[in-house]
């Protein structure tokens, strides 16, 4: 499992010149979460979340409500998939959207 610093470094290097990841990344049990806002998506982004465990989903829903995000977007890593990658505001990985 990558460290938080490795993820932040990856996000800093992964976008094009017009894209800068300026939102904080927070660690929690089971992974990390962050968010972004644009015309298409206003979601809590959960990175490195493992499985569909109920406790994780409950915690993510609670955080999404606190952050006033209408959706949770899971970018998951499992079954040997590469680390979830964010490019230009798009999540490139297995994505699961859940309405809060």
Model feature map: region roles:
Residues 6-13, 33-37, 54-59:
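A broad, low-specificity signal for short, low-complexity segments enriched in glycine/proline
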Residues 1-27:
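Amide-forming acyltransferase catalytic core, primarily the GNAT-like/NAT-type
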Residues 41-88:
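Acyl-donor binding region in acyl/amide transferases
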Residues 19-55:
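Conserved donor-binding loop and adjoining core beta-sheet/short helix segment
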Residues 23, 27-30, 67-70, 88-92:
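Short glycine/proline-enriched coil/turn segments at helix->beta-strand junctions
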Residues 2-10, 36-40, 75-100:
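Terminal substrate-recognition subdomain of acyl/acetyltransferases
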């Amino acid at each position: 499992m990558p460290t938080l610093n490795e993820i932040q470094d990856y996000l800093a290097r992964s976008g094009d010149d017009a894209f800068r990841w300026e939102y904080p990344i927070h660690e929690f049990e089971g992974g990390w979460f962050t968010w972004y806002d644009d015309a298409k998506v206003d979601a809590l982004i959960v990175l490195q979340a493992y499985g569909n465990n109920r406790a994780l989903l409950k915690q993510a829903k609670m955080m999404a409500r606190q952050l006033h995000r209408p959706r949770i977007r899971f970018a998951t890593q499992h079954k040997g998939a590469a680390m979830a990658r964010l490019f230009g505001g798009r999540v490139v990985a297995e994505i699961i959207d859940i309405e809060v």
